[in-house]
Amino acid sequence: MAGLRARGGPGPGLLALSALGFCLMLQVSAKRPPKTPPCPPSCSCTRDTAFCVDSKAVPRNLPSEVISLTLVNAAFSEIQDGAFSHLPLLQFLLLNSNKFTLIGDNAFTGLSHLQYLFIENNDIWALSKFTFRGLKSLTHLSLANNNLQTLPRDIFRPLDILNDLDLRGNSLNCDCKVKWLVEWLAHTNTTVAPIYCASPPRFQEHKVQDLPLREFDCITTDFVLYQTLAFPAVSAEPFLYSSDLYLALAQPGVSACTILKWDYVERQLRDYDRIPAPSAVHCKPMVVDSQLYVVVAQLFGGSYIYHWDPNTTRFTRLQDIDPQRVRKPNDLEAFRIDGDWYFAVADSSKAGATSLYRWHQNGFYSHQALHPWHRDTDLEFVDGEGKPRLIVSSSSQAPVIYQWSRTQKQFVAQGEVTQVPDAQAVKHFRAGRDSYLCLSRYIGDSKILRWEGTRFSEVQALPSRGSLALQPFLVGGRRYLALGSDFSFTQIYQWDEGRQKFVRFQELAVQAPRAFCYMPAGDAQLLLAPSFKGQTLVYRHIVVDLSA
């Protein structure tokens, strides 16, 4: 029985056959060719390289070990966010002779090992600011022979170790958008081949590296809507009282003089108080001997002077203005001469006379009647060369100039501004040593006149059909003129020092403005535009760097 094999166990022959089969399998396996790496039809691939022609998109089915990719004559126009993120080992990328026009933000995100990036001979007209974000290993970048006219500011900032940059063969427009590049080229350690401007004509064929920074005039300004006051108004007067900033608005539509207070925390105008005024045309605040008064001029129902009582924190009526002297007020001007306070009221009624009032101890008293029966529309006080003057515009004759007589302590007629017989409003400003008048007209052109020593001469005419309001003002060394109209938008002009004229600067959508008021409020420079038909708008003056 010892020679018998156990039941169910393999015999020697079967074991030998199994061993032979295993050996044959090993031989067959050893002769099988290596597996072909994945490769799209438009590409030729090896284990670590890919060369693609006429691709309709960034190829996705590529070997994961690819470190070099070339795209030629691709049929798509934009490289989008993360287009190559599936190739994290990529070290070399060539994009040549493609139809690209735009490369977006984060287009090369995920390529932290990329060292060489060549984007050449394409039709790229724009790069996004963060196109090259994430390329921390990039040492060589070529953007040669594309259609680039500008480059976003600081586009190369993410490229910490960039050694070589090629921007040749582009159509760079050397305007303010390129100023940053000139500054960067002057300080970078990156080697950059010479590049040249294609435009503007004055810089054409100039080397970008050699452009003087002083040739770039890139700082401009703008008036942007800052706050909307949801009510009409016909006058606006800012004033300081007890270190706070306020604004008085005449609002006949709500039968009040509205007082707003500037909130320095919220940086907005807030409701503060109201003075009853059913037909107010002007609310003039005056701070005399630390006391606040508001002269309320009304078309009907009489005009009054109110006093602010700090103990009761309310306005109380202090004084009535004789309705026989002030019948139909249209404008109000307050000023100080030789230490005394005055205000003048322009009377637009046929039987009225513009009147001057003087402060004396506890009230304002009639001091002088000026210019009777001429339907006066506006007043402008001018204190220049030590000679206080009051200019009165009228709808029935040329503006009249009065000069203060210190002997008589009254205004004495000095002459007329004959160039503008029907001015609605009159304002003045100084530029250098010259004095100018701005006169608005409802029909015809508004005029800018310059004082020539003995007379005014016209220097400029501004189209202004339907104008009842204009205002020159100065903001940070820049001089502007706001010119309103009942039939079109408000025009903002800026003074050109070289030409000694105003040039059109900006258009503001203000309906039927009745005044313009410049109001500095901390670091905010504000222009208020009270509207007779719509909302009162507050614009902020901002400085814009076009090279940013």
Curated annotation (Swiss-Prot):
Pfam families: EPTP, LRR_8. Residues 1-30 form the signal peptide. LRR repeats lie at residues 89-110, 113-134, 137-158. Widely expressed, with highest levels in brain and lung. Residues 170-220 form the LRRCT domain. Glycans are attached at residues 189, 311. SUPFAM superfamilies: L domain-like, Soluble quinoprotein glucose dehydrogenase. GO terms for biological process: exocytosis; regulation of exocytosis. It is found in: Secreted; Cytoplasmic vesicle, Secretory vesicle, Synaptic vesicle; Synapse, Synaptosome; Cell projection, Axon. Residues 31-64 form the LRRNT domain. EAR repeats lie at residues 222-264, 268-310, 314-361, 363-406, 410-453, 455-497, 501-543. PROSITE patterns: EAR, LRR. InterPro entries: Cys-rich_flank_reg_C (IPR000483), EAR (IPR009039), EPTP (IPR005492), Leu-rich_rpt (IPR001611), Leu-rich_rpt_typical-subtyp (IPR003591), LGI_related (IPR051295), LRR_dom_sf (IPR032675), Quinoprot_gluc/sorb_DH_b-prop (IPR011041). Keywords: Cell projection, Cytoplasmic vesicle, Disease variant, Exocytosis, Glycoprotein, Intellectual disability, Leucine-rich repeat, Repeat, Secreted, Signal, Synapse, Synaptosome. SMART domains: LRR_TYP, LRRCT. GO terms for cellular component: extracellular region; extracellular space; juxtaparanode region of axon; synaptic vesicle. Gene3D superfamilies: Ribonuclease Inhibitor. May participate in the regulation of neuronal exocytosis. Interacts with STX1A. It is linked to Intellectual developmental disorder with muscle tone abnormalities and distal skeletal defects: An autosomal recessive disorder characterized by global developmental delay, intellectual disability, distal deformities with diminished reflexes, visible facial myokymia, and distinctive electromyographic features suggestive of motor nerve instability. This is Leucine-rich repeat LGI family member 3. It comes from Homo sapiens (Human).
